[in-house]
Amino acid sequence: TDQAATAFAAGKVDAVGAFPPFTGTAMKRPGARVIASSKEYPGAIPDLLAVSGDLISERPDDVQKIVKTWWDVREFMEKNPRKSEKIMAKRAGIPTREYKQYKGGTRFFSLEENLEAFSDGFGMKHMPYAAKQMADFMVKVGFIPEKPDMSKLFDSSFVKNIS
């Protein structure tokens, strides 16, 4: 994404799909403007933690520790927002003030929202539904030849163990 944003900023390509912090690079191009963002499509572009099925079957305790660590980090972020912003900005390689610009477009799910996201239902807030919609679209436009088996794609047990 960094190379694509840099190419766009240099005028080598006409459009780019980017996410923070690379949107900052893209927006340095004179006349650049955002034509669509994830703000207009809530729930359609989630960030998530994915691990292999092998890791789950071979080291489930370690996977559980990773998930617990995420919730420990979330608690730290809530209790230490300024320090968290500095840490995340440094990790992204951008000034804290620039990181703050992106913060409004970032939403972290609560534990309850995570559980709901794993559940069956209709609408993009339900990951099984969203995955089906995306797979159908990718088949329709020829990006993939057929819809993959998604029966074992989501495992809510690690999040449920936190609650």
Q: What are the language-model segments listed below?
A:
Residues 2-96:
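Pocket-lining segment of extracytoplasmic ligand-binding domains
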Residues 21, 40, 102, 151-152:
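Residue-level "edge-of-site" marker
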Residues 37, 98-99, 148-149:
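Residue-level detector of family-conserved "landmark" positions at structurally sensitive sites
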Residues 131-163:
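Conserved C-terminal helix/tail region of periplasmic/extracytoplasmic solute-binding proteins
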Residues 57-143:
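Secondary-structure end/capping motifs
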Residues 38-45, 104-107, 156:
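A glycine-rich, aromatic-flanked flexible loop/lid motif
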Residues 52, 110, 155:
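Residue-level signal for threonine
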